[in-house]
């Protein structure tokens, strides 16, 4: 008999809008833990742990090599270097430490994971939800709810937006290759004119081939359900275009480094909530004043490209900088705006109006555009607010005039640019802005503004579940940061306590005990009573040596051994006295990583017949020589211009090769030569004897603009590093 399924469409942290799917008890229980919940992992990735240890040892080698200087910084927009001193070049104490650490890793006891934090039903529910291609799971656009939609409903809203010819046009095929050529031509010019170095050019070239951009939606369930695309069934979606790995991804980072500082120079700029609260403390009101909030509707998709580029040009002119390549930056920005093609449901589109959320520079670009809009619209207004503050597309102000005057003010603003539409809320007592409620209050006979915490109606306060597989200090840190936020926003103790009660009531069902919560609350309250308001600490890690591993019982045990070994090294190396090892943990996969994807999953994904031959490596070892090396970067069968390794699964021997072409193409050539013997080569003879099905290929290192000479040199280095020459490997003498 199947598991009982709930007919209730909603749960405290889950909104199920799917008509064809109902949540089982196990699925409801699983999702209610939140998308940040991490299930207890079932195994330790020893390869990754070995690579992490190597990275730590590399830091120690470099520290010794450069005279224990802690002030070294990497040039911006460059790939991290993998270079490290040879073993022969390091001191004997450090060599001994490395040996002790490696021995500690090799002798790690088999650490048992704590009790599984999911029931058998929840584990099966995770598998079922992951494999269900008929539904789409997304986090809500605002708040912390998880939204489940029918695939058909999600597609309906997506195509409603994509069929708007004003914003998007269909394409027969992607144009990324053509765009990549244009981007690289501009980058080559920047390098020729010495605005960027060769290392920066290599970084900004990006991945080859570039990853296709993906379009997806975040459901706006905070909107009035009666106004949804299909009322109460299909909410409107916020369009996002994932830019990761595209031909302009690194270029967007470079552009943002120039645009972001300029975007903060307008008079209405608000950095964050705390800046906003501090600004309001200085405001004095006249009797009869109103306060208002204004929201710019769908700002990103409504920005006129010509006006947006002109706004950027204007701010470049306003703040000239001879070291800034203005014309090239504008060309790169224009390409990012006009060549923003993407894929959705195996179809291709081009965005022709506005910009996509997902670009690194999108926020700064929108900020500059609105700053220019403000500069040109305010002279048209006969009456202006006495206070006008803006955080991106959210505006707060004080209006000392009549309601009629405010209505006239809004008409002027709404008619200034055709595409810019504003929604306003004018109130005599209080308005909501960001995560604050701003209210008019009298203090010492003076009218001013106070603030308290504002919780959106869709906010379920679904902070990290206490049983999630995280380090213990994480839970306390999350709660503490919220309580600090309450005290920095709220003016009155009663408001702090009200917000705290709301949060704690939501956290108790999520595994947090009353004693645990009260203890943190007491600690924060006492720190503020002493006049110490905890703030974000400045970077103080100049004498810290990071040891970064994925959180598991094995990594915790290894960290302890490594710190002990480092303590002994400090006794013999005086220069290390001011340094200490700090352990930082990388998270395991959470529910969002498993269940939420940018791409819409295909009903029947095509299986690449070459996929069984490919394996992702984090660490490579030649067992016939005991030589090893970490593998950095991510690779696939589409990766090109790279060094690769082929291992025989029978005898574990390695072959190192290089190719300019996609790895898939090189693999096909190797398989053809194995199946059709016509050369007397060690590699092909070996797999003719052991079977091509025992061949496994992996990417080891790649470079976007490597020449043949560079690839051949890298190939020799890898062969030497692992000693893969026959008979220790399958490479022939060069």
Spans of features found by a protein language model:
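Charged structural interfaces that engage phosphate-rich ligands
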Residues: 1-734
């Amino acid at each position: 008999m199947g598991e009982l399924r709930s007919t209730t469409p909603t749960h405290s942290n889950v909104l199920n809008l799917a008509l064809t799917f109902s949540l089982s008890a196990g699925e409801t229980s699983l999702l209610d833990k939140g998308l940040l919940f991490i299930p207890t992992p079932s195994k330790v990735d020893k390869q990754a742990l070995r690579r992490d240890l190597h990275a730590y040892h590399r830091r120690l080698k470099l520290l010794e090599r450069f005279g224990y200087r802690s002030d070294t910084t990497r040039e911006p927009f460059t790939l991290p270097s993998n270079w490290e001193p040879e073993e022969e070049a390091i001191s004997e104490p450090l060599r001994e430490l490395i040996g002790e650490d490696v021995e500690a890793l090799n002798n790690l006891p088999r650490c048992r994971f704590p009790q599984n934090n999911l029931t058998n039903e929840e584990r099966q529910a995770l598998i079922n939800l992951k494999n269900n291609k008929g539904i789409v799971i997304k986090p809500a656009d605002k708040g912390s709810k998880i939204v489940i939609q029918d695939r058909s409903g999600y597609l309906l809203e997506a195509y409603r937006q994509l069929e708007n010819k004003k914003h998007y046009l269909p394409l027969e095929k992607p144009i990324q290759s053509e765009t990549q050529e244009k981007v690289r031509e501009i980058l080559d010019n920047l390098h020729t004119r010495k605005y960027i170095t060769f290392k920066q050019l290599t970084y900004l070239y990006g991945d080859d081939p570039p990853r296709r951009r993906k379009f997806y939606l975040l459901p706006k369930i905070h909107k009035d359900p009666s106004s949804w695309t299909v009322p109460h069934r299909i909410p409107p979606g916020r369009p996002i275009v994932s830019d990761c790995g595209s031909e302009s991804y690194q270029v967007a980072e470079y552009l943002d480094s120039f645009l972001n500082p300029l975007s903060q120079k307008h008079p209405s700029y608000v950095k964050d909530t705390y800046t906003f609260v501090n600004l309001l403390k200085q405001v004095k009101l006249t009797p009869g004043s109103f306060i208002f909030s204004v929201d710019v509707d769908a700002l990103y998709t409504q920005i006129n490209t010509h006006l947006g580029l002109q706004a950027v040009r204007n701010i470049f002119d306003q703040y000239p900088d001879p070291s800034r390549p203005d014309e090239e930056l504008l060309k790169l920005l224009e390409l990012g705006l006009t060549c923003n093609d993407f894929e959705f449901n195996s179809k291709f589109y081009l965005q022709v109006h506005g910009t996509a959320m997902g670009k690194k520079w999108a926020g700064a670009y929108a900020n500059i555009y609105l700053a220019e809009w403000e500069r040109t619209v305010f002279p048209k207004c006969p009456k202006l607010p006495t206070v006008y503050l803006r955080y991106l597309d959210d505006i707060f102000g004080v209006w000392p005039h009549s309601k009629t005057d405010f209505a006239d003010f809004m008409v002027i603003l709404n008619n200034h640019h055709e595409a810019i539409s504003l929604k306003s809320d004018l109130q005599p007592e209080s308005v909501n802005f960001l995560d604050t409620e701003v209210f008019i209050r009298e203090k010492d006979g003076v009218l001013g503004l106070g603030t308290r915490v504002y919780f959106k109606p869709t906010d379920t306060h679904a902070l990290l579940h206490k049983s999630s597989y995280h380090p213990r200090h994480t839970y306390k840190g999350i709660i503490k940061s919220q309580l600090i936020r309450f005290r920095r926003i709220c003016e009155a103790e009663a408001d702090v306590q009200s917000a705290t009660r709301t949060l704690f009531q939501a956290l108790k069902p999520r595994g947090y005990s009353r004693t645990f919560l009260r203890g943190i609350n007491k600690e924060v309250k006492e720190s503020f009573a002493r006049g110490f308001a905890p703030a974000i600490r400045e970077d103080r890690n100049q004498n810290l040596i990071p040891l970064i591993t994925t959180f598991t019982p094995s990594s915790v045990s290894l960290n302890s051994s490594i710190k002990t070994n480092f303590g002994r090294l400090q006794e013999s190396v005086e220069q290390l006295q001011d340094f200490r090892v700090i352990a930082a943990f990388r998270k395991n996969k959470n529910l969002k990583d498993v269940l939420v994807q940018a791409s819409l999953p295909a009903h029947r994904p095509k299986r690449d017949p070459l996929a069984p031959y490919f394996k992702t490596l984090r660490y490579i070892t030649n067992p016939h020589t005991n030589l090893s090396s970490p593998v950095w970067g991510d690779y696939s069968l589409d990766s090109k211009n790279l060094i690769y390794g082929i291992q025989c699964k029978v005898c574990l021997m390695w072959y190192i090769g290089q190719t300019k072409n996609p790895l898939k193409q090189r693999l096909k050539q190797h398989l053809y030569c194995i199946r059709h013997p016509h050369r007397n080569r060690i590699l092909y003879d070996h797999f003719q004897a052991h079977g091509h099905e025992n061949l496994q290929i992996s990417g080891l290192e790649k470079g976007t603009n490597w020449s043949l000479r560079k690839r051949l040199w890298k190939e020799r280095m890898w062969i030497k590093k692992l000693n893969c020459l026959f008979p220790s490997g399958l490479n022939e003498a060069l």
